[in-house]
Amino acid sequence: FGKSMVLHREPVAAIRKYVDEMGLETTIMYDMAHVLGLTGDHFQKPFQEGAEIVTGSTHKTFFGPQRGIVGVNYKKGELKYGLWETIESRAFPGSVSNHHLGTQLGLLMAAYEMNQFKDAYQAAVVSNAKSFAKSLKAAGLDVAGDPAIDYTETHQVIVNVGYGAG
């Protein structure tokens, strides 16, 4: 899962249920780059819904410096925990050549702020996007999404302007 334009929750629970019913040995990964700051009661809880790996960006709806995160829902001793160990050992040093220590304090402060204010922040972000979408529609614009839920479940609003016209 994961994409740049996100109006709705991803069907993580439905996919988890399907692969489990089919007996498929699979790993569900959810790239939450654009919606990481909405994770929780106001949007989606991917680990509780069945995702095993979550990646994200700390500079979009999570309002910190430009960094990335990887988290897993594996416990030490489980067979798939080896996947986490591989990811962890190859991230730094390895694929990442600079861990940018100068941004870590900013990320820490953003994390503290998110922990303190996330409920109000997340609710406001989604509410503002819904209000914006309704206002655009009322002004005559072609707003994408389901009007029954005010067009969006996230921070994003999409306006159809025509192919290659926007």
Predicted segments, located by residue:
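Conserved PLP-enzyme active-site core in the AAT-like
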Residues: F1-D142, V161
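Conserved PLP-binding catalytic core of the aspartate aminotransferase-like
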Residues: V143-G166
